[in-house]
Amino acid sequence: MEELGLATAKVTVTKEASHHREADLYQKMKSLESKLDFFNIQEEYIKYEYKNLKRELLHAQEEVKRIRSVPLLIGQLLEMVDSNTGIVQSTSGSTLCVRILSTIDRELLKPSASVALQRHSNALVDTLPPESDSSIHLLGADEKPSESYSDIGGGDIQKQEMREAVELPLTHHNLYKQIGIDPPRGVLLYGPPGTGKTMLAKAVAHHTSAAFIRVVGSEFVQKYLGEGPRLVRDVFRLARENSPAIIFIDEIDAIATKRFDAQTGADREVQRILMELLNQMDGFDVSVNVKVIMATNRQDTLDPALLRPGRLDRKIEFPLPDRRQKRLIFQVITSKMNLSDEVDLEDYVSRPDKLSGAEIQSICQEAGMHAIRKNRYVILPKDFEKGYKASIKKNTHEFNFYN
């Protein structure tokens, strides 16, 4: 009997323990279900908030897009007042204190930075690349000039001097280090018009992997005070950022004439441009691999400070071609032309008239145009005679193209 009672008690205890476990599991399940419901509610709330925030973001993006819509005004940042306000100068010459759009990266807002201003409120709404507001154009490897040394007739001495001063320092810089000398920093090309100065500069750019920046001296003369010196700084900064590079300034006499006691604001501004150019050339680091080529037809008017060694170390003269040079130029130009066997180029080479390479090119072009006018595919001696007389304007009474 005692054993039966003990067994019954054990069964009772086991049932009670099982009941308690079921109750605990039920409580845990209810607790987890309530947490799940809470999380579901939170999820729905977060989804709702996400939709609202996304709607607000799209609205804000549309508003920023509307504010930045063109046309915009171009200006220059002078200084920052605080993180949300700055002082700018617009292209109209006005100096303004303006608000700055909150989405603009403040690291890009440096003094002299080019900025875009909203046309109604003048608020600063965007930053621009430094070269975006100027006429400076950097020619990459795929935009290089197509002219090569073989396209230039004659000028062997000029080609050699140019290669030594510009091409070799860019392609074999270590050669100058081993010899222990500094390569020339700048080259001046001077001579009469049409003698191949610009063409040789293009050929050097074609034969090197350097970036090529071409500007004309008159482009530095701007309407507003200080714009010209800033363009000079932009040219040299762009060259340093893309080194090795070649800066070619054509018609340098537009800004580099001898200084004098200027009486007008325009003359003083041109002299400030020249001083900035001198300063930029003095600040050159030889190791940067940036070469400056300048060309002019009036070397006698240039300022002596620009011509001194250390700025323009090499000066290359381009005289009018002699008889041998004229022969080579004629051969290069006519190599792709369909000439009659009767055409004797030596007759035109031996004539005493002083001709530049551009005038020889004009003679050949006029000869070809005369053949086209007569519906011929072959250029005859009389076409060359017509072209010769038309180009050098010897006989104006024969300047009748249709006879």
Swiss-Prot record:
One of its GO terms (molecular function) is ATP hydrolysis activity. One of its GO terms (cellular component) is proteasome regulatory particle. CDD domains: RecA-like_PAN_like. The modification N-acetylmethionine is found at M1. Pfam families: AAA (PF00004), AAA_lid_3 (PF17862), Prot_ATP_ID_OB_C (PF16450). It comes from the Eukaryota. The keyword ATP-binding applies. Belongs to the AAA ATPase family. This is 26S proteasome regulatory subunit 6B homolog. The gene is psmC4.
